[in-house]
Amino acid sequence: MGKGLLGKRVAIGGSRKTEEISTIIEKQGGIPVIRPLQGTVYLAEKQVEPDLRTFAEEKADWVIFTTGIGLETLVDMAEKIGLKDEFLQAIRQAKAACRGYKTLSALKKLGITPEASDEDGTTRGLIRSLEPHDFSGKTVMVQLHGEKAPALMAFLEEKGASVLPILPYQHIPPEEETVERLCRELMNDEVDAVCFTTAIQVRSLFDFAKGRGYINEVKKVFEERAIAAAVGKVTAEALREEGITRLLAPEIERMGAMIVELAKYYEEKE
């Protein structure tokens, strides 16, 4: 194996498989710096129940699902509060749209064929498929997963929709101390690259930087010095939504492939 990351300090934003990813970085000559940005995603049954009741009773013109597990969880939650039939009826009466093949599969299991779905697993792809439809004055229920999907929400609101977001899984941000430390390391040129393995990690870093007033400095670092690496399309899309265009993402959506891509970038740069 080459040494494309020789002497490079590579921050890891994930909290799973950190030993495995650290080993790959070290084999490439790099120095892994573990800075967990994931936080905790938890099942928010109590918080979601009022929204679920509203949707089951008042219905919607459109329903948009962004994850398969989110759809399945909402069905389970509706069953627990005695509204499964009403919930399924509300979905079946509405026009449906979805992001990702797992979500499409979960809808088909319920006998629902969506009117719109992405071609590439991204929110941008989902928005493209929704473009031809009229949302003016329409009520749209959107199932989200731990984060707010700002581009999708802005698109629907611009189209004149009334949006009811439902988050069966909600997010507790990571430890402030960890994110503060990474922001400082970026601004002080102490980190050469940051590896993001989920969109939530991207939001955690940039939301924190916005809150602390570091956002312009952090963006400048990614534009000029440190490189952002994304494990796949959805994570890369979250970076672009934050205004980061100088980034790497492997064709094969694997952590190992992301590190190899990063090493290749530095080898070619040298």
UniProtKB/Swiss-Prot annotation:
A GO term, aspect molecular function: uroporphyrinogen-III synthase activity
Biological process according to GO: uroporphyrinogen III biosynthetic process
Superkingdom classification of source: Bacteria
Pfam families xrefs: HEM4
InterPro entries tied to this protein: 4pyrrol_syn_uPrphyn_synt_sf, 4pyrrol_synth_uPrphyn_synth, UROS/Hem4
Signal peptide extent: none
Name used for this protein in its record: Uncharacterized protein YjjA
Name of the gene: yjjA
